[in-house]
């Protein structure tokens, strides 16, 4: 293959990747805003026509959403928006507790009851941006960043990486819990949490997660 052919192939691959990103981003946003409800079908042909791309591109975009657990591929039913049912909620919150509570415990061992500003800064910044969020989709992203910042305080690379892998599932959680909050109450609750993870340690984070779980599943 000539250098010109190689350059052309690379450009084509880049364009295909960009198209996949564009479709995945658009459908992801519709899922995370609730425009596409749980169990809604994601149809390749309709999406290809809507976004002006090939069905192959749409298929790759849908596969990305499946990998993010925002969609599920089901035999004979195709790809559908993931259901956020009781079992899914409890499993997600148990995993979050395993990671976030342990991260706060480690941070407490590192810093004691007063974490340094260098560590608190990213969480405080996230709270300020959460308060200034223009819409709930932005709030979902910043809420996730706040919890990532708490986990990062542990300094544990493996825990930080595992928590980051929750990705879009954490955004989806706030979509479902947000009917129980105003933006103001969400910010206020997390400001208190930032103080209490220092003074009370992992118990504060555990209580926070259990409270939000009860909002969705009761008990």
Where are these regions (language model features)?
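Short linear motifs at protein or domain termini
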Residues: 1-109, 214-219
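A general structural signal for well-ordered alpha-helical segments in protein cores
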Residues: 24, 89-92, 100, 116, ...
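Hydrophobic side-chain positions on well-ordered alpha-helices
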Residues: 30, 129-133, 151-153, 196-197
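Hydrophobic, amphipathic alpha-helical faces that serve as interaction scaffolds
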Residues: 95-108, 144-181
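Amphipathic coiled-coil alpha-helices
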Residues: 99, 122-126, 135, 142-149, ...
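Amphipathic alpha-helical dimerization/coiled-coil segments
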Residues: 100-129
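C-terminal all-alpha effector/ligand-binding and dimerization domain
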Residues: 124, 175-219
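Short, solvent-exposed positions on alpha-helices
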Residues: 137, 157-161, 203-207
